[in-house]
Amino acid sequence: PRHRYVDFNQGVDARLFTEENVKQLSRIAIRPLRIAFDNIKTEAQYTRAIEMSSKVGLKDFSNYLLYNFDDHPDDLYHRLRINVELCDRLNVSIYSFPMKYHPIRRTEDMDEDYSHNRDYIGKYWNRKYIRAIQAVLNSTKGKIGKGTSFFMKAFGENIEEYHKLLEMPETMIIYRYFFEWLGLENGGKKTAIEILGNDSICNAR
């Protein structure tokens, strides 16, 4: 027989999870369960929602991680790492899809109308950081799944390595294994610039 699954294509709100709600969700052939994790401030509620879901037998999860909004670049790293660690601890599968925020209409605090371009930069972000994240996602096909070693290779073993990655030339991020083979990834920034050209590295502003 053909197995069919229910997929709510919008993330449910982790703050509204109760034992009864999760019990009812577990009665549905839902795969994956999408739980919103757009703000690091909801970490406790989000983690609790994943734990509660795991206890009733739900094992497949997915979410979009909004960035370039009111968040700090470090927040994206922490949210991704939380998901990877939850996968390991609970033996579940969480696919994360970082999604760049872009306004669809102009508000009073904006200096221009961004509805017809992709130029919006969040308060704590800059163009270089956004391009670096997009370069990583280009290498991972837009998603981050389970696997600590994979995550650490993509985004860094700690926040300091993540910061270094944000400053890397995009070509060096996408073809990192090649540059490692050349021995240029660590301590070879000057040489990399000479190879790639000064235009590959832009000011972090």
Which residues make up each language-model segment?
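Core AdoMet radical
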Residues: 1-49, 59-68, 93-97
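Generic structural signal for well-ordered alpha-helices
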Residues: 22-25, 46-54, 76-84
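Auxiliary Fe-S-binding modules of radical SAM enzymes
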Residues: 70-205
